[in-house]
C-alpha cells in the first residue's frame, strides 16, 4: 500500500472514528492522510487537533482521497452514494463500504457507474487494532479486496468470505463484540456477589476472557477441549457450567446472534 495513499471516511461516527484511530495506531498512516467527514463536523474538533483532516463536505473528501470508506447508517446510504457518485473515479478510487445490509450490486446501482468495491464488516475493537473484519469484493480484479485486506490487517485480523455470508458475519463479528462484553460484565458482577471488589472483579474477568480467547487463537483448539481441561468430576467448574446451561447461557447467545442477523437483513430495506 502506497505511503501516500489517502483515505476518506464518509460518516465519521463510532465505527468510522474507530477505524481512523486504529489506522493511525498501526504506524502506517499519519492523521493528515485521513479525512473525516460528517454533517455535525463540530463533533470532530478533537480529531482536527490531532492532525486529521476534517470536513462536512463529502464530495471534497472524496476528491482528495484514494480510498473512500463509507460508514453511514443504512437509512441514509442511498443519498450519500448518490451525492458522491460524480466525484468517484474508476481508475483512482477504491470504494469500501462498512454499511450493514447494502450489497455490492446495490452500491453499484446507486453510484451509477463501474467501481472497484469492497464490503468490510469490522467491529469496534478496531480502535485497539484487534478487530475481526470480514471482507468481500467485486471484479474486475482484486484491487479493492487487496486494499481492504491491507487496511484492515493493520487493525486486527481479516477473513475473506462470500458476500452472501456478510449478514451472518455482521451478527457474529460486529454485533458479537457487545455480546462478549456483556459476558465479561456478567462475570464481573458474579465476582462482586461472591465477595470481590468491583475493580478487582472486572480486572479478573477481563484478563480471564482474554486468556480464554488466546488459548483458542494461539493453540487452535476447540473450546470444548479446553473446557475439558478445567472440568474435573464433582468439581466446582462443571457445577458452574451446568448451572449456566440450565439457565440457558448457550441458547441465549445463539438466539442473540440469530436475531441480530435477522435484524441486519432488514436495516437497509427499512431505510
State what each model feature region is.
Residues 19, 41-43, 50, 58-135:
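Rossmann-like NAD(P)(H) cofactor-binding subdomain of soluble oxidoreductases
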Residues 1-56, 60-64, 130, 192-194:
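NAD(P)+-binding Rossmann beta1-loop-alpha1 motif at the extreme N-terminus of oxidoreductases
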Residues 2-3, 206-271:
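NAD(P)-dependent Rossmann-like dehydrogenase/reductase catalytic/cofactor-binding core
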Residues 121-126, 170-180:
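Glycine/serine-rich anion-binding loops at beta->alpha junctions
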Residues 106, 110-116, 132-168, 179-220:
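Internal alpha-helical scaffold of NAD(P)-dependent oxidoreductase catalytic cores
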Residues 34, 61, 197-205, 226, ...:
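Small-residue helix-packing motif on alpha-helices
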Residues 30-33, 91-93, 116, 199:
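Short acidic capping loops at alpha-helix termini that bridge into adjacent secondary structure
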Amino acid at each position: 500500500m502506497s505511503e501516500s495513499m489517502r483515505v476518506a471516511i464518509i460518516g465519521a461516527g463510532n465505527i468510522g472514528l474507530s477505524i481512523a484511530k486504529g489506522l493511525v495506531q498501526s504506524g502506517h498512516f499519519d492523521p493528515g492522510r485521513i479525512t473525516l467527514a460528517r454533517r455535525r463536523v463540530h463533533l470532530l474538533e478533537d480529531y482536527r487537533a490531532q492532525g486529521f483532516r476534517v470536513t462536512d463536505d463529502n464530495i471534497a473528501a472524496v476528491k482528495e482521497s484514494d480510498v473512500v470508506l463509507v460508514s453511514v447508517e443504512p437509512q441514509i446510504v442511498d443519498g450519500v452514494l448518490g451525492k458522491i457518485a460524480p466525484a468517484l473515479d474508476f481508475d483512482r478510487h477504491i470504494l469500501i463500504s462498512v454499511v450493514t445490509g447494502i450489497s455490492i450490486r446495490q452500491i453499484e446501482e446507486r453510484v451509477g457507474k463501474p467501481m472497484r468495491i469492497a464490503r468490510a464488516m469490522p467491529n469496534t475493537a478496531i480502535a485497539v487494532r484487534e478487530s475481526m473484519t470480514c471482507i468481500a469484493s467485486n471484479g474486475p480484479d482484486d484491487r479493492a479486496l487487496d486494499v481492504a485486506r491491507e487496511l484492515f490487517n493493520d487493525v486486527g485480523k481479516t477473513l475473506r468470505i462470500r458476500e452472501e455470508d456478510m449478514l451472518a458475519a455482521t451478527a457474529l463479528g460486529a454485533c458479537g463484540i457487545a455480546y462478549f462484553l456483556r459476558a465479561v460484565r456478567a462475570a464481573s458482577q458474579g465476582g462482586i456477589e461472591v465477595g470481590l471488589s468491583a475493580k478487582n472483579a472486572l480486572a479478573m474477568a477481563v484478563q480471564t476472557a482474554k486468556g480464554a480467547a488466546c488459548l483458542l487463537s494461539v493453540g487452535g483448539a476447540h473450546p470444548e477441549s479446553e473446557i475439558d481441561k478445567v472440568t474435573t468430576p464433582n468439581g466446582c467448574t462443571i457445577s458452574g457450567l451446568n448451572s449456566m446451561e440450565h439457565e440457558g447461557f448457550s441458547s441465549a447467545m445463539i438466539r442473540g446472534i440469530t436475531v441480530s442477523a435477522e435484524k441486519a437483513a432488514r436495516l437497509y430495506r427499512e431505510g
